[in-house]
């Protein structure tokens, strides 16, 4: 259906909505009953109106584009490849594979998948620079987050020095790294805390990269050679905050 039905209804002011709600409350206090305070310290109202946006100067009329992504655990290349093709046939626009070990063949995993039109994300459950260097296509995003692994497991993959050596080699080859923000969400951080931890997490990497002359990465470039960061963010249970 392409025809909008909103024009068939008269506009209702925020004041009229609130009066209707107060009538339905039958004497109960509006603020005590319906307004709640979020973990971020925001008083959340039971409804919002376009009038609430009039005093906000930084709203935008459009949103950034996004792709439907299917996550597949790649224990077996053939089975995972079959699942990937099925997901793409059902509307998936990008694929995220969780890779359990370095013996897995990326070529077999991605067989007959159009890598020029389908973004591919690989989450490695191990750390190996040579595995990354042998990836068949530059458009593949390999999520490398040694700090994230330390936070999640309490341990480095090997040790601090070896992990950073692998990290340096991977970043030099791909010009990319990732920040797994989902760990903070899953351990109870609110949205403000997640943003703060994600920025601090990213800053640790940027400081390291800036101080590692062998990487020779220049900041501030806006071309294909610019350093790219992939943020993996979990979706929480607060519907209104998630869609904002």
Regions of interest found by a model, annotated:
Residues 1-241:
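Catalytic alpha/beta active-site cores
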Residues 244:
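Active-site loop/helix belt of alpha/beta enzymes
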């Amino acid at each position: 259906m392409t025809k909008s039905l909103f024009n068939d209804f008269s506009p209702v002011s925020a004041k009229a909505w609130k009066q209707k709600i107060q009538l339905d409350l039958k004497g109960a206090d509006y603020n005590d009953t319906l307004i709640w305070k979020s973990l971020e310290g925001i008083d959340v109202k039971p409804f919002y109106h376009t009038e609430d946006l009039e005093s906000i100067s930084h709203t935008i009329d459009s949103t950034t584009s996004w792709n439907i992504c299917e996550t597949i655990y790649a224990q077996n290349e053939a089975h995972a490849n079959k699942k990937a093709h099925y997901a793409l046939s059902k509307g998936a626009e990008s694929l995220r594979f969780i890779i359990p070990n370095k013996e897995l063949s990326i070529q077999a995993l991605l067989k007959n998948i159009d890598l020029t039109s389908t973004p591919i994300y690989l989450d490695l459950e191990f750390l190996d620079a040579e595995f990354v260097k042998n990836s068949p296509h530059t458009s593949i995003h390999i999520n490398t987050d040694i700090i994230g692994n330390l936070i999640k497991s309490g341990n480095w993959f090997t040790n601090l020095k070896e992990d950073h050596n692998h990290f340096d080699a991977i970043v030099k080859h791909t010009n990319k790294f990732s920040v797994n923000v989902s760990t903070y969400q899953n351990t109870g951080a609110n949205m403000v805390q997640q943003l703060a931890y994600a920025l601090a997490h990213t800053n640790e990497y940027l400081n390291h990269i800036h101080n590692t002359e062998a990487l020779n990465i220049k900041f501030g470039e806006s071309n294909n050679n610019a350093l790219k960061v992939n943020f993996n963010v979990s979706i929480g249970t607060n519907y209104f905050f998630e869609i904002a």
